[in-house]
């Protein structure tokens, strides 16, 4: 998942949940209220973290947890053909995914659990990359490597599909959520076996350049074929399973369908997610609309992308992703409201997903704990208050992340060192069931 770096803290906070007024009451209509839970931070490494995660989701009226269970060719679940993640805490028999499923499915109301898996990114230290990287590893046209596996290598797709089907067979997950389902960029795809296969299928002898249109189309088709074939196998294995994916939305979005082929998703990382949604390869897609609302250009980017997502014929297969880690809390809430509102022609999406549980705002992110200079781009500079040690900053970030769970479902306020008390209004004041995207 692509993250942009932001920074900033508050000197003090006030956790002041207030009473929601009747006018703020939600309709209770089905709506995805999802939360990404990444494995690079705490969230499900220990039994205590899992218990807190479910309690926080209930407090926030979150009804879907998208939990990262395959980070770098590893597993946050015990019954796996890949190695158990090294940072799982507790006894060896503790199974993070199994315990989360038990608590989330037993919650009232029930919380869905979608297993988030990195597809082509494995990391250069993962077992699969160490063992197979020489032949399966993706390479740039200059020979560089970055820990990605190459979609153009048939064995990569076979192995990865096997990992995912094994997960679905062993755990009662509600959905499978694909991330890094793409190339790293336009100059990638040059593993020897992928280039050899392209030459054979295209009937050419020369190695293509990165901008060769046929070579670009071939790489794009490799990614699409993996998604299509995986869906086919998953629906045989478990028809009720929901397949989704984290989708690229770099820069400004298209104004309509005619502009789709000019996007970075389509022509740079070869992720033709518009066709996946139109053809129903995904039950729903989650475009990563990660933009800072306090930057005018990025705010415009966000609004253009969500307009495209609502009015291009596949709104019934879209859950809009918002980047809390790039925003002040009140701005994230504003983005959620805009995402959930009807378009100018009356179209609505299935819901929203928030990135992320560990970084709910620029005050809750750890991207910049050791780098106060990274806060220089923020319009409000809350990097005062005397806390300079890592543990103190982490504790303050944790307090903000906890507060945000309250802000989602209750009126609340917090204290900013420059603006004083800032009041927020909830976006999920009542629980809501998940919709059926099919």
Segment roles from a protein language model:
Residues 15-23:
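C-terminal segment of classical bacterial N-terminal signal peptides
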Residues 28-33, 41-45, 110-170, 209:
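Active-site-adjacent "subsite" loops/lids of carbohydrate-active enzymes
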Residues 43-60, 85-109, 221-232:
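Aromatic- and glycine-enriched glycan-recognition loops and surfaces
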Residues 48-75, 170-175, 275-285, 346-352:
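Catalytic domains of carbohydrate-active enzymes, especially glycoside hydrolases
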Residues 56, 138-281, 288-291:
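Polysaccharide-binding and catalytic clefts of secreted carbohydrate-active enzymes
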Residues 62-94:
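Aromatic-lined carbohydrate-binding/catalytic grooves of carbohydrate-active enzymes
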Residues 64-66, 95-141, 177-180, 226, ...:
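Glycine-rich, aromatic-flanked loop segments that form ligand/cofactor-binding clefts
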Residues 270-299, 305-437:
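Substrate-binding cleft of secreted/luminal carbohydrate-active enzymes
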């Amino acid at each position: 998942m692509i993250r942009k770096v932001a920074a900033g803290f508050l000197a003090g906070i006030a956790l002041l949940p207030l009473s929601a007024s009747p006018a703020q009451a939600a309709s209770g209509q089905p709506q995805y209220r999802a939360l990404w839970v990444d494995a690079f931070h705490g969230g499900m490494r220990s039994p205590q973290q899992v218990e807190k995660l479910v309690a926080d989701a209930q407090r926030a009226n979150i009804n879907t947890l998208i939990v990262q269970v395959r980070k770098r060719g590893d597993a946050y679940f015990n019954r796996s053909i890949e190695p158990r993640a090294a940072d799982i805490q507790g006894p060896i028999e503790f199974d993070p995914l199994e315990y989360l499923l038990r608590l989330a499915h037993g919650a009232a109301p029930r919380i869905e659990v979608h297993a988030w898996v990195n597809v082509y990114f494995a990391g250069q230290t993962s077992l699969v990359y160490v063992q197979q990287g020489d032949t399966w590893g993706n390479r740039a046209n200059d020979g560089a490597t970055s820990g990605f596996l190459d979609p153009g290598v048939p064995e990569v797709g076979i192995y990865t599909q096997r990992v995912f089907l094994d997960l679905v067979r062993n755990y009662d997950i509600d959905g499978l959520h694909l991330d890094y389902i793409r190339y790293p960029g336009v100059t990638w795809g040059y593993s020897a076996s992928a280039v050899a296969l392209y030459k054979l299928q295209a009937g050419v002898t020369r190695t293509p350049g990165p901008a060769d249109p046929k070579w670009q189309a071939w790489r794009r088709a490799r990614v699409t074929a993996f998604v299509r074939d995986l869906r086919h196998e998953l629906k045989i294995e478990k028809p009720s399973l929901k397949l989704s994916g984290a989708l690229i939305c770099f820069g400004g979005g298209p104004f309509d369908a005619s502009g789709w082929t000019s996007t970075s998703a389509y022509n740079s990382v070869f992720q033709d997610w518009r066709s996946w949604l139109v053809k129903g390869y995904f039950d729903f897609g989650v475009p990563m609309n990660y933009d800072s609302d306090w930057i005018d250009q990025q705010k415009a980017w966000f609004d253009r992308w969500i307009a495209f997502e609502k009015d291009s014929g596949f709104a019934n297969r879209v859950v809009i992703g918002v980047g809390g880690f790039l925003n002040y809390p009140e701005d994230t809430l504003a983005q959620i409201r805009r995402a959930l509102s009807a378009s100018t022609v009356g179209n609505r999406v299935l819901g929203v997903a928030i990135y992320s549980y560990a970084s709910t705002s620029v005050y809750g992110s750890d991207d910049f704990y050791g780098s106060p200079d990274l806060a220089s781009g923020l319009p409000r500079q809350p990097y005062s208050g005397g806390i300079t040690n890592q543990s103190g900053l982490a504790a303050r970030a944790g307090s903000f992340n906890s507060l945000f769970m309250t802000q989602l479902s209750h009126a609340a306020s917090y204290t900013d060192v420059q603006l004083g008390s800032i009041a927020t209004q909830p976006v999920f004041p009542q629980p809501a069931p998940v919709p059926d995207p099919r």
